[in-house]
Swiss-Prot record:
Catalytic activity line of the entry: all-trans-octaprenyl diphosphate + 4-hydroxybenzoate = 4-hydroxy-3-(all-trans-octaprenyl)benzoate + diphosphate
PROSITE patterns: UBIA
Keyword Transferase (UniProt): yes
Disulfide bonds: none
UniProt KW keywords: Cell inner membrane, Cell membrane, Magnesium, Membrane, Transferase, Transmembrane, Transmembrane helix, Ubiquinone biosynthesis
Subcellular location: Cell inner membrane
Organism, scientific name: Azoarcus sp. (strain BH72)
GO terms of biological process kind: ubiquinone biosynthetic process
InterPro entries: HB_polyprenyltransferase-like (IPR006370), Prenyltransferase (IPR039653), UbiA_prenyltransferase (IPR000537), UbiA_prenylTrfase_CS (IPR030470), UbiA_sf (IPR044878)
Membrane topology listed for this record: Multi-pass membrane protein
GO cellular component: plasma membrane
Protein name, UniProt field: 4-hydroxybenzoate octaprenyltransferase
UniProt similarity note: Belongs to the UbiA prenyltransferase family.
Superkingdom classification of source: Bacteria
Length: 287
């Protein structure tokens, strides 16, 4: 098989055909950049973080499939992934993940040295998350740290430091990630129970829907506190109100715990993150 034949396989391994993960990683990064820069992040920083988000999410997907290669064949949604079907070798996957990570590192070299230092725990979080499903009862919380680490890095890039408000925003992202990834885990719960991996959907059990809604409430409450501390105005809080309405819509989708509606709720979180960002950006622009 030629390289041109293999490129589509690598694209699938990187989830280039499924941008939802990159968007869920990008929105909190943009929240941080806008807040840190008072609504005017430097263009080069914005470009670097946007490209870096896609690269690191792609690297994380490759590592995830490497870690889960012996499980994915037993799960309906993942059984046709390239590593599960052996269409791509583990050696190829590791080389691809290393290359993507290296490109991400090169991207941030022009930024503040603190960003470079923070990139090391960010890489560790991205690489280790897939393995937490073997040990942690709620690996989605770990995912929230990994997916939200662009927040302290964004503040470091703009301000040269990471103020307390950035860590509160990261905490909000953790609760948001537990909410949306529990919806995702509800899709795979029957298969995950069979193969013995741990997810929040399994841990929460019959309280899964209530836990998801509580996490949404805490996440939005923390983002409200962040906005108040930063002196944001009505448009920011209008964005949070729209996001809250979307969370209530998710309740109507997940309350019966059916696979397709739960997956729809997960994917719809892109718009929830976008609503928060739109409120923040508009508040700086015309508020």
């Amino acid at each position: 098989m030629t390289l041109s034949d293999r490129l589509p396989l690598y694209g699938r391994l990187m989830r280039l055909d499924k941008p939802i993960g990159s968007l869920l990683l990008l929105w909190p990064t943009l929240w941080a950049l806008w807040l840190a820069a008072d609504g005017k992040p430097p263009l080069h920083v914005l470009v670097i973080f946007t490209i870096g988000t896609v690269l690191m999410r792609s690297a994380g997907c490759v590592i995830n499939d490497y870690a889960d290669r012996d499980f994915d064949g037993h799960v309906e949604r993942t059984r046709n992934r390239p590593l599960a079907t052996r269409a791509v070798s583990t050696r190829e996957a590791l080389a691809l993940a290393a290359g993507l990570s290296a490109l991400s590192f090169v991207l941030i070299l022009p930024l503040d040295p603190l960003v470079i230092w923070l990139s090391f725990p960010a890489l560790f979080l991205a690489a280790s998350y897939p393995f937490t499903k073997r040990f942690f009862a709620i690996p989605q919380a770990y995912l929230g740290i990994a997916f939200g680490f662009g927040i302290p890095m964004g503040f470091a890039a703009v301000q040269g430091e990471v103020p307390p408000i950035a860590w509160v925003m990261l905490l909000a992202n953790i609760f948001w990630a537990v909410a949306y990834d529990t919806e995702y885990a509800m899709v795979d719960r029957p298969d995950d129970l069979k193969i013995g991996i741990k997810t929040s959907a399994i841990t929460f059990g019959r309280f899964d829907v209530a836990a998801v809604m509580l996490c949404y409430a805490v996440a939005l409450g923390l983002l409200g506190w962040v906005g108040a501390q930063a002196g944001r105005g009505a448009l920011y809080f209008a964005g949070l109100a729209v996001a809250a309405g979307m969370a209530l819509y998710h309740y109507t989708l997940i309350r019966h715990r059916e696979r397709a509606p739960c997956f729809k709720a997960f994917r719809h979180n892109n718009w929830l993150g976008a609503a928060v960002f739109a409120g923040l950006a508009l508040d700086y622009l015309i508020g």
